[in-house]
Amino acid sequence: MTVFAASQQSAAGAGMLPSHQARLACRAGQADTTAGVAPGYVQGNLAILPEKFAAAFHRFCQLNPKPCPIIGMSDVGNPMIPALGLDLDIRTDLPRYRVWRDGEVIEEPTDIMAHWRDDLVAFVIGCSFSFEEALLADDIAIRHIDCKVRVPMYRTNIPCAPAGPFAGPMVVSMRPMKPKDAIRAVQITSRFPSVHGAPVHIGLPQSIGIADIAKPDYGDPVPIADDELPVFWACGVTPQAVIAAAKVPFAITHAPGLMLVTDLKNKHLAVL
């Protein structure tokens, strides 16, 4: 049993929200993927930037709502985002982070206490893990959960709309499905626009610039059966690609597949 799973069982007995318990497990140094953790609760990608870049990045997200739907944002210099969760501290409550300098990852710590500054603004961006609960409820299997690995993610040739220094390709996540399940997945995920919504592409990975489906740019590869199609969703790792391209002097993000678990409920994100 993972620490996350054990923590959630303990949380149920203590009356603590599973989402809060998941964050406490992160503070204790737990670094598992958060796929399947705290079912029913919204998870988010993270991008933290100096205030001088925050307005341009906010505009970038507004222009690219499929890969970058903002679900929360901190005040300048404040690591707490109470609208997203009880006692939520953006510096400690993810399993692992990436620290960037001039577009390069220089460190992947389990907390960012030593890197926090008074001029930083945190953006929490919707994550496709939130709609996976709805897929599972409709008996659509999620391969990376079954395989206990991180979801595979790929840089594509789909351009994002630029804003200030931020421009670059969309990143997508992939889940293999039988054709009938892919059709149903389009219907289900269309109800969740604040966590990427419907797929952006189905099948033929090379037509969106993916040369080798077995070699994801982020996350882990998963097997695809002969009777399955790769189904691609816009992904909240897109900011990491544009931060790298912009060579921002300093930034912090989540490590791909290792998300912030919030106290928001997935069911409250559905629009239909």
Curated annotation (Swiss-Prot):
The lineage of its organism: Bacteria, Pseudomonadati, Pseudomonadota, Alphaproteobacteria, Hyphomicrobiales. Gene3D superfamilies: PSTPO5379-like (3.40.1640.10), PSTPO5379-like domain (3.30.2040.10). Keywords: Lyase. Signal peptide: none annotated. It comes from the Bacteria. Belongs to the D-glutamate cyclase family. One of its GO terms (molecular function) is lyase activity. InterPro entries: D-Glu_cyclase (IPR009906), Putative_hydro-lyase (IPR038021), UPF0317 (IPR016938). Its EC number is 4.2.1.-. This is Putative hydro-lyase RPB_3621.
